Each structure stands twice: as C-alpha cells, then as structure tokens.
Amino acid sequence: MIFRSSDRPPEGISRREWRRRNLQTTPPVSTADAAPAPVPVAPEPAPQSTAPDLDDNRPTILTVCTGNICRSPMAEVLLRARLEPLGVRVHSAGTHALVDHTMTEPAQEIAVELGAGADAASGHRARYLVEPMLKDADLVLTMAREHRSHSVQLMPSALKRTFTLREFARLASTLSTESARAAADAAGDDPRERLRAAALAVTEQRGLTPAAPDEDDIIDPYRRSRETYELSASQLAPGIDDVERVVRAALIR
C-alpha cells in the first residue's frame, strides 16, 4: 500500500499501527463469541476525541472491548455513575472500534436499567483504542482476554494495571478492603498514584487465586438476541461492584 500525505495516522496512532489497520479487513474473532464481529472502520482517520485529555489529572479508568458499542461502554457508564462523584474519570475505547457509532439500543437500555445515567448512555460515541489512552489510564479493564492482550501489546508498561473485568473481580475477591487501602496509603497522597498502587495490589493476587481463564471473558452480544445482551450484562455487572470497592478503598481515607 502506498501512503499519501492525506493518509497520515491520527493523533496517538503510530504509522506502523495505522498501516496495519488499513491493511486489515476483518477484526480477530472473539474466543468468547462466535457471532459476527464488528467490521473495523480503518480507512477514515479517527476523530480527535480518540486522544485522551492529558490535562485532566483525575484518576482514570479505561474500559476496552472490540467495537466500543456494547460491552466497554456499558462498563464505562456504570462505573461513571458510581465513581464520578469521587473525582474519577471513566472512558472507553475499542480495538476495532465502529468510530462515532452510538451504543446499541439493547446495551443502552440495559445499562440504564442497571443504574447508568441515560444521558451518558445515549451520548456515547465509539473510539479507537490508542497508545496515549493506555499510558494515561491508572486502571485498564477489558471485556475479554483478547482485548487485554491487544492492550498490553500496544503498551507493555501497562501490564500490571490491565485486567479483564471478570479477572479483576476474581482477584479482588481475595484482597480485603483494608489491604487495598494500605497499599494505596503506601503510595502517598496523590489520587492517581493511590489508584495505581491499589491496582498493583490486585495484580499481586494473580499467584494466589485459582486461574479460571475461560471465565475471565464477557460474551460479546453484538448482533445477537436480547437474551444474549442480558447474559453479557450479568457477566459484567458483578465486576462493577468489585471495582467500586477497590477504588473507594484507594481514594477515600
């Protein structure tokens, strides 16, 4: 492929990564779901909103899935409803995002039923996952192992703060609130450092809890039945509780 001056990659995407996305015709198939995956929208440059606001110094959580129209925005708006009052910024992105698409209607409806703000759900627009988002995030929560792998490949230094949402819940189940708070206290007063320290404390449980990799993924409901959306939400929702508990332990003194 010959790249013209108009083919410059958008902000936050390396030329190598942009070339890979332009050459790619279909996204990887999720191991958790045999349904058709969303088709990537690589030919058009991603909007400027793909770059995080680096001037925003709030503790930051990033959620990641494939198309950024079902699972990761549902996790985003549910976490935002609970954690924004604590000064936490929550946003989401997709490894093969359907850029500028809204959340699917069932995802919006279920998210609101579970406590998300209606405006936040309807206002979502899908974005590509790019390196600056991962660098800026204090905690990265993916919806499946394939997204965790993709994120760590883009930003290897994010390994110890990147989990699937269900993996985080499984690991956090063996970490007491007091232990999470103690880890945060050891990091000092900066909220972002405190959240990263709590995430590291969860990481350290990886050798202490039974591995259950097949249960670490959340099924992709895209183009599937309402029942599949509800199953996906039922796999996602318990992890929201665990994230909230750990974040509160880290930030509330």
What residue ranges belong to the model's regions?
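Short secondary-structure boundary segments
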Residues: 144-145, 166
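Conserved active-site segments centered on acidic
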Residues: 2-137, 146-153, 157-160, 248-250
